[in-house]
């Protein structure tokens, strides 16, 4: 019988890297802002977006995408925001139903259960002009349906 690495392990680890500016709430007036408003009431606002009214080019209605991206790259996550992210991802540790990541399975099927051993968010690191964090996911029972994240 041949060794099958894909099925011979009892857990997997995946690490994802993303810029911290992805954690900034949506720009007021954006499609995402209005979508969240319809679903959840008023979405959170963030002082990051104050530059649109105060620090951007006052002759334009909107700051160009390049200026917005430069502003995002200069943004740094605060301790409270990082701790809130860690608390949020911590809720996914343990055993949970990952039905949405399976194929042709009923929601109540016990085979949808997956166990997240560890979800770890690193301290931010600046590369170039952008601040990055990594998220480590260490889970069991993810081989069959290849659940890579949430």
Feature roles, as predicted:
Residues 1-150:
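Structured-RNA-binding interfaces characteristic of tRNA pseudouridine synthases
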């Amino acid at each position: 019988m041949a060794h099958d690495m894909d099925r011979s392990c009892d857990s997997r680890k995946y690490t994802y890297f993303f810029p911290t500016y992805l954690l900034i709430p949506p720009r007021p007036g954006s499609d995402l802002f209005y979508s969240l408003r319809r679903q959840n009431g008023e979405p959170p606002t963030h002082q990051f977006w104050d530059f649109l009214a105060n620090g951007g080019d006052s002759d334009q209605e909107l700051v160009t995408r390049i200026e917005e991206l430069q502003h995002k790259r200069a943004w740094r996550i605060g301790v409270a925001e990082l701790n809130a992210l860690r608390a949020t991802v911590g809720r996914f540790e343990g055993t949970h139903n990952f039905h949405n990541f399976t194929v042709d399975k009923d929601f109540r099927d016990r085979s949808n259960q997956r166990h997240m051993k560890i979800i770890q968010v690193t301290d931010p690191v600046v590369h170039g002009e952008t601040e990055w964090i990594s998220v480590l996911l260490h889970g069991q029972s993810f081989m069959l349906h290849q659940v890579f994240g949430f």
